[in-house]
Regions:
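N-terminal alpha-helical segment
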Residues: 53, 341, 424-429, 485
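Alpha-helical scaffold segments in carbohydrate-active enzymes
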Residues: 104-111, 258-261, 389-400, 431, ...
Length: 538
């Protein structure tokens, strides 16, 4: 029986080009997971979009002397190009400035307000006296009070991932003027997290199979006591507050409305497909499963704050899992577009086959700890594992068949050696599938590549290029077995490398069309043409 699987993926700020850390942190893992669930027959809804209200956008707009919408339009278009080139299979990739999103944000705000989970409170907010304006949290930088990182932002420290308020920073400085920030009293709406603390704590205790760094952090955060958090700010750029109690110059704070985007994107998908109630299959159906693919800096918002909002709103599904990745490091530093650490994604896509890039990243996913990635290691994997092992295997078998047989004859009389190889593959799909379902994506790819090695070993041991000189029938059996195994390898590798896997699958005529399993190869017909799958780097 098929299941409804919601794959919710972090919303990138439309403020700058992406890098490998973003792709390996959230978007590639989500796509691997979604593609697997589709091929086994589950109903997948994969959603995200460009976050257009984050303060990094206004910071960039100020620096370039343009309007925030100009920055948004530029980078949203750029992101769409990335997803197309990398074959990221969105069901809906949208933005946080659609009418649907604003309506859903207002609905949740009003519902929580009516339930007493939102109230007005006075607080101190960073202020730049020389500019005569309040400063959004990301306009403030200083030293982290927890780890002493010198470039911590007013909302979070990139080094230790602690969420912060600007007044906690040591020597907080305005990014606009460079002057020390002052703090002035202002009034805002706050989300009363304390009201759902007990219920949230009980829910977290039910979560099994989460990555240790996610569940341990979430439990620790709640154990320390949840503090009410401001959900509005003194801003010009953002979603309007649906009530007028605070006066002008106030907007909904991005961290509150961005996570609501998963729900609004699902509703928008249903509207686009003329099935306005279809979103309920993933949000109201108690049997549905929801997975949030994010980086570790987003754990507070997805493992604590978003579940708190959902608990307060009531009746919507809570996360099944939040498989947050840690950081991809470049020469010991977190990859960062804003700080220029690591190449941009455009630079890699100009040089790499997108599937090869997906493979290199998937081989180094930072699932349990920060993961160093170097271009030399990526090139080694491409040359040794894709070109020499997988791509060469396909070419060897295809060329042997084309050079020696007009077509493969009907198969029978397979040896124990042949049947043993094919039986190994029958087990592989269950083992690797279980690993993917646990979001163990790096190890499941390693396991899949072991089967490429098995086929190469089988081919080297059986030597059909020699056997054909004395026993053409036996050589045909060997190549039939190898071709069956290659088709199975393409199925195993499809979630990771969809484009090249489809090229292989489409070139092999089959009597069955299993997308996740071993197929019966059609005999008596010619193979379709297939070119080189990957290029070697010098």
């Amino acid at each position: 029986m098929s299941k409804n699987i919601l794959v919710a993926v972090a919303w990138p700020y439309a403020s700058g080009s992406r890098h490998l850390g973003h792709i390996g942190g959230a978007y590639l893992p989500a796509d691997i997971f979604a593609r697997y669930h589709r091929v086994i027959g589950n109903d997948v809804l994969m959603v995200s979009g460009s976050d257009v209200h984050g303060t990094p956008i206004t910071v960039r707009a100020d620096a370039e002397g343009v309007k925030p919408i100009d920055i948004v339009n530029k980078y949203h278009k750029e992101f769409l190009g990335y997803w197309d080139k990398l074959s990221i299979s969105w069901d809906n990739y949208t933005t946080t400035m659609t009418e649907t999103h604003i309506e859903v944000v207002h609905d949740i705000f009003n519902e929580l307000l009516n339930k007493g989970l939102i109230d007005k409170q006075k607080s101190l907010q960073a202020y730049d006296a020389s500019e005569n304006k309040f400063l959004p949290d990301r306009y403030v930088e200083g030293t982290c009070p927890y780890c002493s990182y010198a470039e911590a932002r007013g909302d979070q420290c990139d080094s230790c991932s602690k969420t912060l308020d600007p007044e906690e920073l040591i020597n907080p400085v305005s990014k606009i003027s460079g002057n020390l920030a002052e703090f002035k009293e202002t009034e805002h709406f706050f989300l009363k997290l304390s009201m759902v603390e007990s219920e949230l704590s009980k829910w977290l205790e039910t979560k099994k199979g989460w990555r240790p760094h996610v569940i341990n952090w979430a439990k620790s955060f709640v154990k320390d006591g949840l503090q009410d958090r401001a959900i509005t700010r003194d801003l010009d750029w953002g979603i309007k507050i649906p009530v007028d109690d605070l006066g002008p110059g106030k907007k909904i704070y991005v961290w509150f409305e961005a996570v609501i985007g998963y729900l609004s994107a699902s509703k928008e998908w249903a509207q686009i497909n003329n099935k306005p109630d279809e979103w309920e299959n993933w949000w109201l159906n108690p049997e549905a499963e929801t997975f949030y693919f994010i980086g570790k800096d987003n754990v507070p918002f997805h493992a604590v704050i978003w579940p708190s909002i959902l608990l307060g709103y009531e009746n919507l599904n809570l996360p099944t899992n939040v498989p947050a990745n840690q950081y991809i490091l470049v020469k010991g530093e977190k990859a960062s577009a804003s700080r220029g650490v690591g190449k941009t994604l455009d630079e890699y896509l100009d040089e790499w086959n997108p599937d090869a890039l997906r493979y290199a990243l998937a081989s180094a996913l930072p699932e349990q700890s920060d993961s160093e990635i170097s271009e030399s290691e990526m090139i080694r994997r491409n040359n040794e594992e894709l070109v020499a092992a997988w791509g060469n295997l396909v070419q060897r078998v295809f060329s042997q068949i084309k050079n020696n047989f007009d077509k493969l004859d009907e198969m029978s009389d397979l040896t124990n050696e042949d049947e043993s190889l094919l039986n190994d593959f029958e087990n592989a799909f269950e083992v690797i599938g279980n690993m993917i379902e646990k979001v163990e994506l790096k190890s499941s790819l390693q396991e899949a590549m072991k089967y490429v090695s098995k086929v190469n070993s089988y081919l080297n041991e059986t030597e059909p290029w020699k056997v054909i000189k004395e026993d053409e029938k036996r050589a045909s059996r060997i190549l039939y077995t190898s071709l069956t195994a290659i088709d199975a390898c393409a199925n195993l590798l499809y979630p990771y490398m969809p484009t090249t896997s489809e090229l292989v699958r489409d070139a092999i005529p089959k009597e069955t069309e299993k997308l996740w399993g071993v197929n019966k190869i059609k005999t008596g017909v010619k193979l379709n043409e297939i070119g080189l799958l990957f290029k070697k780097f010098d």
